[in-house]
Every structure is written in C-alpha cells, then in structure tokens.
C-alpha cells in the first residue's frame, strides 16, 4: 500500500481540474510534524506562479475538486498554500487489516525489471579488508530490497582476477607447490602476495620468469590457466567464509571477474576506431571526450589501449557495461563503488553511450559511498597503521558482543549465547554502516555501534524482541487474532498505524536511490512510535477485549514490519535477548 502515490494522484487530478497543466507536480510528502497531518501537498507554489495566481487561492480551488472521501478525515490549507491531509482512522484500520492478511504486508510488486547490481569486488590473492565492507553490505541491502519488490536481480561480483601481477603470483604458487610437495592450501593470502612481490622485486630471474608467465597466461596456455584458476578458487573459497559470516547473499556463482570481458576488448577497440571515436595518439589508442576537460581546458583523452597493446580498466568497464546490456539484458545497472572512482566511471559510460552500446533508456547508476574512518577522522587502520582485515574486524565484533551478551544474560546456555552474540556483533557492524548516508564518510566506533540505545542494531533487535514478548504474555495465537477487528481511536494508535503503512514508501525510496539509511531511519522511528504507544495505550490491561485485540494487531504488524525491514538490510533478528 503506497499512500503517498495514492494521494499524489488524487491531488494531481484536483490540480488539473483547477486549471493546472497535466504535468503538474503535487509534491505530496510525509508531514514532518503531527500538527501538519500525515501528508502535505506542497506543489501549489510552483504551479500558482505559472498560472499567475496566489498559491493559497489555487489551494482553495484544488480543495473544491479534491475527493478524499474514505481516505482523509480532515484536509486543511496551511500557510501560503500547503495542503495538510489527516488520514481517516477507519482507512488506517482497514489497511492495517489488509497488511496483516498479506505475506508481503500489503506491499505491491512494481513492474518487474532485470537489474544488475555490481558490488563487493575483492581482488584475487588478497584478503578482504575493511575497504570492501561498505560495497559488500550496502550492495547486498539494495539486492535484498529489489528482490523483495519482485525484480529479477543479477548479482555481479566484479572480482579483480586479471592483470600483470598474475605472472608473479603463478610463479610463486608454482615454487611453493614444488617446495611443499604438490597441493597446498593458502591460509595466509596476504603473506602469499607479500612474499611473491618481495621475490619479484629482489630476484631478477624470478621476475623474468613471472613476465614470461603473464604472456603465456594471456595467450591462453592451459597449464597457466589452470594455475590461475587455482588462485581464483582459493581466494573465493576464503571470501565465501566472510560473505557467510556477514550474512550477505553473494555466492561463487555471482563472480563475474575482469577476465570475463577479455575476449571482448580487441573488438571494442576496433569498433571505437571504426566509429571515429578512438584515435591514435603518441602510440596509444585514445578517446577524446568534450564533456571532460584537462588543465589546459582541452577535451580530455581517455586511453583505451596502451602503446604496448595492453588494455586498461576503462576498456574493461566499457566491455562490462556492454555485456550487461546485450547479454544479461539489464533494464538498469547499479554500481556500488567508492566515490573516488566516479570520474573514471563517468568517462567509461560517456564512451559507452557515444558508441551506442547501452541506450539512454537503460540507467547506469554509480551509487557511490564515502570512506570508513577511525575516531581520529583518518582512514580506519590497525594500531600499527596497517590495513584492517575484514575477518579480524568480524572476530573482534563477535568477541565484544559475546562479552556484552554474557554480562546481560549470565545464565544463558553457551550455544544460545553464541548465536545471540553473532546476531548482535555482526548486526552492529553492518547496521552502523547502513544507518549512515552512504555518500558521506563515517566514523567507526565500537561503543556507539554496540549500544542498546539510539539508532543501533542492538536497540533495533531488542525493540523487536520486546514486541514479541507482548504476544508471549498475551497467550493468544495468530488464528484467534486474525478474526478480530482493528479499531483506531487514540492519537498514538493512529500515528503508529500511519507509520506502519508507510513501509512500502520506504522500500520504494531505498530501491530507487540505493539508500539503506532511509530504511534504518524508518525502522528506528517505528520502534520509537511503538514505545510511546505501548506506554500510553495499555495492551494486555486494555479496558475490554476488543481494544486489547486491536492493539495486539498493531503490535503484531509492528513486529512483522521490523523483522521484514531488518531482513532487507541483512540484519538478523532473534526471538529473545
């Protein structure tokens, strides 16, 4: 149920009847304050100016045509021409009933699209570090939301599995296997990469062999392809452990590494030349873009093939966008890549559009994000100044949550404590990130993220268990409750009901903008409204059974909404805390 969309259409029709143009924008928004109703239509200012009349005069005319019978109990004009809409309690009650009767809580499915989501993208032969956290969990929240809404989502894990460093890595893997009698497990990927690089820098014979191996790998030699595949397998097996711990939905089947696009690169360069978009410049192949200027104010040259014949990330990203449209049949492509890559992506996509590889009707969207910073405001590092491994961060989250949970539940059985600590610890790390606007940098702070008050995972998980505890005390089953009517008489009941019915609007914003913090803010607000409702509207000690059951149903929809909302974020809920 999208009340905002329903009201927008009603107000728009009334505006047209009052003389506004057919493309007028009613600008219906959720009201910021209770005294302004549940929704406010702010579109009179802009339209009145075009019509040469006072906004309040237009608002008065709109009201004569606005039929919100059965939807609103009161509609009033405020200030210079805002229209405040107060929802009818009977309308709220009816739609709370409908939401409870639906597995999807009354959320409609929009027109189905095929949406490719590019996220996570770790590198082969390197361990995942904190720099991979934001892309992985923000991207996964977008995927979960889009899938819930009914879209066909293709997860694309754009793994860094190609490049000149693979000659060095294969040579080192070969050396290790010879010295360790055949098969070996790479327990320490970081150490493996570091040792390979050290040998490459210090041993000229090893470096020469590594350079030869690159050529053989790139020419498709089966032995070197096999060694390369082994490195990819070892890395992705380790990464899968991290994905599973993080409760993200990525699997090995979602890997679409850089190497996938290699066969396309020569054809793309040739095609861009044939179309007159790419030219030779100082031995390299370059596309000059008028949209981007260099320091001299001239069109910027973007290299797509080096003079030695090598390709660049830009070439791969052009091929990647083309593949996602032509082969995966994407209607929309979302990239969860940090903000420092913005110009690079814009240049690649400008070439993609000019070449006609992806039509303008298919959006290519860079859902960029800021950096994770330490308390000192600098990039998050270890005490020694090194990169923080993601596995180490999750270990610490689990350890801190374990202590916290044990403190509050000294008699909890060990297996239950471990399960709860995992949900709280991992949930805290994820929620702390997801609850911030992704476009900004944010400060990583253990004390804040593990607090049981404020907009945190432990608070949200606790809020959910608190609602469930009402049901345990009520000793009533869902079947008995289903037949009971919802009656809304108190203001706090109406406020909670209206907020519950705004779940679809919240999902729609997250799906459109890729902003999970909007869902976090909604759920936190919902938990606060339930808290006020619980305090001022007695549930179990209500004046009669009808009121008791009605309030239990509001509590029931709150629990279901909190659980489903947290699930779209990839945050686990627990029954007891």
Swiss-Prot record:
<keyword id="KW-0547">Nucleotide-binding</keyword>
<dbReference type="InterPro" id="IPR014729">
    <property type="entry name" value="Rossmann-like_a/b/a_fold"/>
</dbReference>
<dbReference type="InterPro" id="IPR008909">
    <property type="entry name" value="DALR_anticod-bd"/>
</dbReference>
<keyword id="KW-0648">Protein biosynthesis</keyword>
<dbReference type="InterPro" id="IPR009080">
    <property type="entry name" value="tRNAsynth_Ia_anticodon-bd"/>
</dbReference>
<keyword id="KW-0436">Ligase</keyword>
<keyword id="KW-0067">ATP-binding</keyword>
<dbReference type="GO" id="GO:0004814">
    <property type="term" value="F:arginine-tRNA ligase activity"/>
</dbReference>
<protein>
    <recommendedName>
        <fullName>Arginine--tRNA ligase</fullName>
        <ecNumber>6.1.1.19</ecNumber>
    </recommendedName>
</protein>
<dbReference type="Pfam" id="PF00750">
    <property type="entry name" value="tRNA-synt_1d"/>
</dbReference>
<dbReference type="InterPro" id="IPR001278">
    <property type="entry name" value="Arg-tRNA-ligase"/>
</dbReference>
<dbReference type="Pfam" id="PF05746">
    <property type="entry name" value="DALR_1"/>
</dbReference>
<dbReference type="Pfam" id="PF03485">
    <property type="entry name" value="Arg_tRNA_synt_N"/>
</dbReference>
<dbReference type="InterPro" id="IPR005148">
    <property type="entry name" value="Arg-tRNA-synth_N"/>
</dbReference>
<keyword id="KW-0030">Aminoacyl-tRNA synthetase</keyword>
<dbReference type="GO" id="GO:0005737">
    <property type="term" value="C:cytoplasm"/>
</dbReference>
<dbReference type="InterPro" id="IPR001412">
    <property type="entry name" value="aa-tRNA-synth_I_CS"/>
</dbReference>
<feature type="short sequence motif" description="'HIGH' region">
    <location>
        <begin position="122"/>
        <end position="132"/>
    </location>
</feature>
<comment type="similarity">
    <text>Belongs to the class-I aminoacyl-tRNA synthetase family.</text>
</comment>
<dbReference type="GO" id="GO:0005524">
    <property type="term" value="F:ATP binding"/>
</dbReference>
<dbReference type="InterPro" id="IPR036695">
    <property type="entry name" value="Arg-tRNA-synth_N_sf"/>
</dbReference>
<comment type="subunit">
    <text>Monomer.</text>
</comment>
<dbReference type="InterPro" id="IPR035684">
    <property type="entry name" value="ArgRS_core"/>
</dbReference>
<keyword id="KW-0963">Cytoplasm</keyword>
<dbReference type="GO" id="GO:0006420">
    <property type="term" value="P:arginyl-tRNA aminoacylation"/>
</dbReference>
